[in-house]
Amino acid sequence: DQVTDPELKKAVTAFIGQEAMHGREHEAYNEAVAKAGMPVDAMEARVHWLLEELKLYSPKSMQLSATIALEHFTAIMADKLLADERIMGGSDEVMAKIWNWHALEETEHKAVAFDVWKVAMQGRPEAYASRALGLVLATVIFWPLVAEFHWRMVRADK
């Protein structure tokens, strides 16, 4: 509601649309991976629960701060995937295309949440501390989940 700049509003609308498409693609991908025997349903349920808890118990500024951090993490991973062809080397061609699309999609909107943050938190003394706390929160939740989910999928792939 605080965003009045037409260009930023347009970017936010594009971000929301892209995230909706992203969600649909994730559902199709997860379905295919689940059919291959991966424990996707349990992992997806856990992420959904965590996001709902964040919404329930965190102010909107913290939710936005966590979003900024998560978008930053995924953009870093996407940049690495796109820059180093060894990462997808030997992968199924269809899966490699999906992951490349996913990486491109992540890099397209990586700054939108931060741009909204700058508008929403402009001049507020707690802005930096809140953003830093969001980064810490996202870090201690996201990276252990990435490691756990990787481990679970490697185990299931035996």
Predicted regions and their residues:
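Non-heme di-metal
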Residues: 1-158
